[in-house]
Curated annotation (Swiss-Prot):
Species this chain originates from: Halorubrum lacusprofundi (strain ATCC 49239 / DSM 5036 / JCM 8891 / ACAM 34)
Keyword Cell division: no
Any GO CC annotation of this UniProt entry: ribosome
Membrane-crossing segments per the record: none
Protein name: Small ribosomal subunit protein eS24
InterPro entries, A to Z: Nucleotide-bd_a/b_plait_sf, Ribosomal_eS24, Ribosomal_eS24_CS, Ribosomal_uL23/eL15/eS24_sf
GO BP terms, alphabetized: translation
Ligase found in the keyword field: no
Pfam families assigned to the protein according to its UniProt record, in alphabetical order: Ribosomal_S24e
Gene3D superfamilies: 3.30.70.330
Length: 102
């Protein structure tokens, strides 16, 4: 899977960068987690700092346009993002599980 950055917009108030990207794939639309990991590797960030919001594939095409938010730290993502988006991206689940056990 090949990921190309279309645009980047800094958002210093929320300690993040908003990114539009395009990915080319051979099979079906890739999962949110695999796109997140590929995007994190391309940007040299930890995968917990990347939140994929949107993936849009046109019928019959092997290109997906997406929107992601890349935070400065994983804590910034936990503070700003809504719970359902964190669950979709599998961020913070281990931290919450540890807190519930204590």
């Amino acid at each position: 899977m090949d990921v190309d950055i279309i645009s980047e917009e800094e958002n210093p108030m929320l300690h993040r960068t908003d990114i539009r990207f395009e990915t080319t794939h051979e099979e079906a639309t890739p999962s949110r987690l695999s796109v997140r990991d590929s995007l994190a590797a391309k940007l040299d960030k930890a995968s917990e700092e990347v939140v994929v919001h949107e993936l849009d594939t046109k019928f019959g095409m092997r290109k997906t346009i997406g929107y992601a938010k890349v935070y400065d730290t994983a804590e910034d993502a936990l503070d700003v993002e809504q719970e359902y988006m964190l669950e979709r991206n599998k961020i913070g689940g281990e931290v919450e599980a540890d807190a519930e056990e204590a």
